[in-house]
């Protein structure tokens, strides 16, 4: 019996050793974590255009969502179609969708087209809700110079009427000033500025479909 036990143990040793080597090999293939990556911000320039009139409406900016692959602080890039990769030493300070919400609210507020603009979650009753969805934010290295591709979907909702007034997708491309992560950040902010200007115009135009409770003020 002792001989049998020794054989069983000796048979298990090579298997355990092989498993340990396999795990070690897989670990070696994993990229080493970066302790102090370079952090970057989305911070588009202030929107310059002003609304033709101020409507007595409260606008709520909903929490933006992001499509899979872009719901992360990692900075995405592509070198060939359908293959999403991330920079190892550079990342966003927060996920782009989370940074987008305050920027959209600020742009709507600066345009001066509404009585007030609030961000979700809020206890303030709203007339309009602006939902946003980040479909794509990536630096494309398939062409030279590289370029940033930004796609954002905006939905305007009549809160009191419980209906969607309109949905529109905005798509912008901006050539990066340099073929690196920082060049992509610069291009992303320029593209975002244009998208926010278009989104503000869209939201103001759609708000005209709603009655307002007070006389508009100039």
Model-predicted segments: where are they?
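Bacterial N-terminal signal peptides that target proteins for export
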Residues: 2-17
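C-terminal motif of bacterial Sec signal peptides marking the signal peptidase cleavage site
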Residues: 22-25
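A structural "domain/chain start" motif
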Residues: 27-96, 206-218
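Short secondary-structure boundary motifs at beta->alpha junctions and helix caps
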Residues: 82-91, 160-201
């Amino acid at each position: 019996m002792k001989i049998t036990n020794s054989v069983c143990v000796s048979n298990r040793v090579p298997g355990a050793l092989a498993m340990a080597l396999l795990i070690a090999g897989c670990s070696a293939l994993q990229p080493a974590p970066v302790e102090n990556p370079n952090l970057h911000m989305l911070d588009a320039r202030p929107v310059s255009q002003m609304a033709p009139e101020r409507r007595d409406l409260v606008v709520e900016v909903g929490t933006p969502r992001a499509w899979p692959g872009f719901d992360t602080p990692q900075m995405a890039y592509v070198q060939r179609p359908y293959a999403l990769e991330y920079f190892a030493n550079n990342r966003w300070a927060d996920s782009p969708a989370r940074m987008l919400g305050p920027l959209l609210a600020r742009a709507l507020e600066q345009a001066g087209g509404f009585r007030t603009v609030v961000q979700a979650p809020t206890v303030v009753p709203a007339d309009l809700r602006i939902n946003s969805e980040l479909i794509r934010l990536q630096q494309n290295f398939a062409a030279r110079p590289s370029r940033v591709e930004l796609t954002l979907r905006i939905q305007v909702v009549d809160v009191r009427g419980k209906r969607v007034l309109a949905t529109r997708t905005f798509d912008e491309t901006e050539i990066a000033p340099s073929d690196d992560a920082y060049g992509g950040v610069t291009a992303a902010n320029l593209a975002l500025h244009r998208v926010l200007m278009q989104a503000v115009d869209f939201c103001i135009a759609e708000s005209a479909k709603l009655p307002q409770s007070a006389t508009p003020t100039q």
